[in-house]
Design a protein with these regions (language model features):
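A generic structural micro-feature
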Residues: 24-26, 71-73, 81-83, 104
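A generic structural micro-environment signature
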Residues: 42, 72, 87-90, 108-110
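Short, acidic Ser/Thr/Gly-rich low-complexity loop/linker segments typical of extracellular
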Residues: 58-78
């Protein structure tokens, strides 16, 4: 959590199933999917909130929770930002410092991976 993000979520959300995530993309709006470690190596982010800021700023304006996503080919862990205005953004690390720069394009889904 960044210093500005002061609340926590007491009840982790259960895994989501195939087809249960709705993206609201179109003219001037895209989405961001952040693939995360699965936790088998101890580095998992399941249940952790990840935050997005406007590029050049360190204050998050939106956050989402990394969750298990159950797909026909197996489970993956990801955080989904379903509707983000076109622009330049920074995914903040757990310490609130800039971690990944991303560009959101109109009507498209941008994907990045935190899996190392």
């Amino acid at each position: 959590m960044s210093p500005e993000h002061t609340h926590t979520h007491e009840h982790p959300l259960p895994p989501s199933g195939n087809g249960t995530v709705l993206l609201d993309i179109g003219d001037g709006v895209g989405a961001l999917v952040v693939h995360a470690p699965d936790g088998l190596d101890g580095a998992g982010l399941d249940g952790v909130e990840i935050e997005l800021s406007h590029r050049g700023e360190r204050q998050a304006f939106v956050h989402t929770e990394v969750r298990e996503r159950r797909l026909p080919e197996g489970s993956v862990y990801a955080g989904v930002f379903p509707a983000v205005a076109v622009g330049e953004y920074t995914l903040l690390g757990l310490d609130g410092a800039p971690d990944h720069e991303v560009t959101i394009s109109s009507g498209k889904v941008t994907e990045i991976s935190l899996v190392r």
